[in-house]
Amino acid sequence: MTDSGEIDPQTAEEKVTDAQTAALSLSNLSTARRNEALTAIADTIERNVDRILEANAADVADAEKQVDAGEYTQAFVDRLTLSTSKIESIAEMVRSVAEQDDPLGETLTARELDDDLNLYKVTVPIGVIGTVFESRPDALVQISALSLKSGNAVILKGGSEAERSNRVLYNCILEATPEVPSGWAQLIEAREDVQTLLEMDDAVDLIMPRGSSSFVQYVQDNTSIPVLGHTEGVCHVYVDSEADLEMATAVAYDAKVQYPAVCNAVETLLVHESVAPSFLSQMMKQYRDAGVEIRGDERTQSIVDTESNISEEIIAATEADWTTEYGDRIVSIAVVDSLTDAIDHINMYGSKHTESILTQDDNRAEQFMRAVDAASVFHNASTRFADGFRFGLGAEVGISTGKIHARGPVGLDGLTTYKYHLEGDGQQVATYAGSDAKPFDHAEFDETWPVRNDDG
């Protein structure tokens, strides 16, 4: 495939089949060779900054026309836009993945079943990962790098709005990895290819969608392949009665304003009634100065109307606001009677993504953190910390709000599964069955697989 868009003669089915074949070889590629390939990807991206920017500028120009037509938001275009510094950050991200410990071949458990009968639980790649993402061309590189490091083949389907950017970045990856099994990374571009991908449950082991809540929901509803992702990021910050209000103002500002377009930005601010007047007088001025639109419940509106030092205008919040991921400089505010009410509100309207309590009372914080149902729950910290890099996981492929396999920011570990290796010496099950069955030891011990004899 060329940058200019020459049609790839392979069908989506053929590409997935090739990826399935490549996955078997890729799982046995040494750590050193995978890391060398990742370093080569970073170098190739840096050498092609002008080529990448040219393609991205064309994508952005088309997207800006869609903003004018009311089809896209400016936040959507912001996610699409690349810059020299952002491309440099992408290259550094790839290098950071290369520098991480190998997630493969780790012995999670070693258990002696009997003399010379030892069981090992060892990490292995998942296999073939299909990913469908919107607007962010950097996601293509991020997902490819993490897939390569974890020994997985990957099928990449980006949005048409980033077609040129995705194509150039994909070609950079292929140019950098001639020593990696052919077919390990595949780019599909046609809209109808998405449905093909979702139907190939015999070849694709995991689907990772990244995009709007409706988009992710569509993927979940139209495949029998396991889906790792989240439909939306309706994150809350609760300002408790025992909060340090100066801290609370700073954290709530960061959680909304630092980068409002991402899924870990706060969308709803809950405020205990005892501190609401004093807190809102500080908070609303800061939000106004940052251009944040405020939508408040009746109690919030009443405080604004009665407090002489609050001059900001607010919009009446509707029921829909409590379940909306704005992805923009908009925040909804509700005043609550108690900590329990805050917890109940979050568990009713939240998306199980990231929630935060601001309080100086550790007992109240513990109650909140135990009771709130979310992948990440914070105490006195911005919701924006819900990120694989900030968690020390390296780059992430996304955030999962599910509870099976992986939860929260998903890095390399989330792209592996495990295999059981049993090392024996001719043992038979009959020995351990019947009236005179030999008992198992089931004793865990410290040893890694593979086990090497002294003579090699």
Swiss-Prot record:
Pathway: Amino-acid biosynthesis; L-proline biosynthesis; L-glutamate 5-semialdehyde from L-glutamate: step 2/2. One of its GO terms (molecular function) is NADP binding. GO terms for cellular component: cytoplasm. The keyword Ribonucleoprotein does not apply. One of its GO terms (biological process) is L-proline biosynthetic process. It is found in: Cytoplasm. The keyword Oxidoreductase applies. Its EC number is 1.2.1.41. It catalyses: L-glutamate 5-semialdehyde + phosphate + NADP(+) = L-glutamyl 5-phosphate + NADPH + H(+). Keywords: Amino-acid biosynthesis, Cytoplasm, NADP, Oxidoreductase, Proline biosynthesis. SUPFAM superfamilies: ALDH-like (SSF53720). NCBIfam families: PRK00197.1 (NF001221), proA (TIGR00407). Belongs to the gamma-glutamyl phosphate reductase family. Catalyzes the NADPH-dependent reduction of L-glutamate 5-phosphate into L-glutamate 5-semialdehyde and phosphate. The product spontaneously undergoes cyclization to form 1-pyrroline-5-carboxylate. HAMAP family: ProA. This is Gamma-glutamyl phosphate reductase. It comes from Haloquadratum walsbyi (strain DSM 16790 / HBSQ001). The gene is proA.
